[in-house]
Amino acid sequence: MSGTANSRRKEVLRVPVIDLNRVSDEEQLLPVVRAILLQHDTFLLKNYANKAVLDALLAGLTTKDLPDTSQGFDANFTGTLPLEDDVWLEQYIFDTDPQLRFDRKCRNESLCSIYSRLFKLGLFFAQLCVKSVVSSAELQDCISTSHYATKLTRYFNDNGSTHDGADAGATVLPTGDDFQYLFERDYVTFLPTGVLTIFPCAKAIRYKPSTMATTDNSWVSIDEPDCLLFHTGTLLARWSQGMHTTSPLQIDPRANIVSLTIWPPLTTPISSKGEGTIANHLLEQQIKAFPKVAQQYYPRELSILRLQDAMKFVKELFTVCETVLSLNALSRSTGVPPELHVLLPQISSMMKRKIVQDDILKLLTIWSDAYVVELNSRGELTMNLPKRDNLTTLTNKSRTLAFVERAESWYQQVIASKDEIMTDVPAFKINKRRSSSNSKTVLSSKVQTKSSNANALNNSRYLANSKENFMYKEKMPDSQANLMDRLRERERRSAALLSQRQKRYQQFLAMKMTQVFDILFSLTRGQPYTETYLSSLIVDSLQDSNNPIGTKEASEILAGLQGILPMDISVHQVDGGLKVYRWNSLDKNRFSKLLQIHKSKQQD
């Protein structure tokens, strides 16, 4: 039974294969391609007649026809470009529309022969793909033998043979047996923007099956060297109007991979909604793929794309912050705003990346009133949702929509500026802090003035002292022994003072235990209560008393009560370190007796 289940699981993850020995003409291939594209974005082609010729040409590329490294890489993203790990990229673009000129031609005979064979096959299947999932008759006729654009890409590595699957580190053991080392491949993400991309050898490539989410970092390796691989691009997915979706591939550049991508002419509009032409979309993809080249030829466009990524990040971060703060407000029984460093781990977990304080302050740059960010008495930043009345909540638009509109307005102002475009949203600088009533702001300069006035009063009182206090007396000669004695005496006094403070602090907590016990006694027994909920409830209940306490003191008092009444109050620690308290019955008389015993032990 388990073997059958495993075989079914493997069949689900298998790439669809078109066997040309079974289907060959267009009438037979069209329904097959349509059925594949409704569920997949990758398929293999088996028993291609010229596959042996392609393999021989690919082998010659690795050993004989080396790329011309002296031609450079121009603003059209054509030529030869050195990459990492001794890998070279060779790329050529061709367009039948005379409005766009790509003057660099491919002079490599083997690469040209590969291009001619891949182009005929790729153009045929590109037309099939468009007819399969694109309903517009005008778009179905946009690709033909006289109207097209192509991009030929080749990766070259001198040591590429060491990374081929079958010949990876092959050697012969003393026994005469063959032994092979398996090298770990280094994959890079590859997202075609055209209608279709064809690979002459389905090897050193990984794809994402349709059963996996786009954000899931799970890939399935393809090792079918006797097949050609076809992968649809983002243009076909956009023109299909939801009938077809595509996802990125992962390729190993060190495996000397060659690919051919096919478009309609690059001046073709993507849609009638003013989204630009195919050339704009291709330029954007090339800028993202080669940022170093774009920094030289298209610095402004590169900055705009990076700023777009930053805007996408802050929009997603705002949505997550809304969720976290709303859940935090529901779980807390007091209106005390949470500290920002307490919220960051949960926000980072939901964002699936590390979020720091400056990332939160970027939201205030877009919308300064999005959140109430203040400094508490401990010097920590607190973050809370702004107060809104019910009428405003019902009549105004959602906060997320309001933030998106403000973000778009801020973005348009930045890119409309003639100055150098920033690549990220700057963090908001907090120059003011709110008063305790949240009704007005107190300038830091006023605070400094107030403190300086207080110092002036202190100085005036000090000047009224006698003259002898300002005269330096002559120091008596001292020895090293007396100095050590004074240091030891100072340490003893410091230790005694610290012990006295700790004792008084414990006495203060013991005094507050009665009030906290009354709060617990008023709650429903037999119910679980988190330490966060109880601490915030205790702080809120005692904030109007003579000696209010904080959440830290409340947690220590709860632990002390559980230590005095271990049979009555139980505590359990769940995943993440959160403590949960529960009690069934509480006796005030018994607690009073045990509390007196606890206080007497502290005095002793």
Curated annotation (Swiss-Prot):
GO molecular function, one term: DNA replication origin binding
UniProt keyword annotations, A-Z: Cell cycle, Cell division, Cytoplasm, DNA-binding, Mitosis, Nucleus
Function: DNA replication licensing factor, required for pre-replication complex assembly. Faithful duplication of the genetic material requires 'once per cell cycle' DNA replication initiation and elongation. Central to this control is the tightly regulated formation of prereplicative complexes (preRCs) at future origins of DNA replication. Required for the recruitment of the MCM2-7 helicase complex to the replication origins.
GO cellular component: cytoplasm; nuclear pre-replicative complex; nucleoplasm; nucleus
Membership in a protein family: Belongs to the Cdt1 family.
Subunit structure: Associates with the MCM2-7 complex. Interacts with MCM2, ORC1, ORC2 and ORC6.
Protein name: Cell division cycle protein CDT1
Additional detail: Present with 2190 molecules/cell in log phase SD medium.
Membrane-crossing residue ranges in chain numbering: none
Gene field: TAH11
Record has Cell cycle as a keyword: yes
Pfam families, A to Z: CDT1_C
Keyword Lipid metabolism: no
GO process terms (BP): cell division; double-strand break repair via break-induced replication; pre-replicative complex assembly involved in nuclear cell cycle DNA replication; regulation of DNA-templated DNA replication initiation
Subcellular location field: Cytoplasm; Nucleus
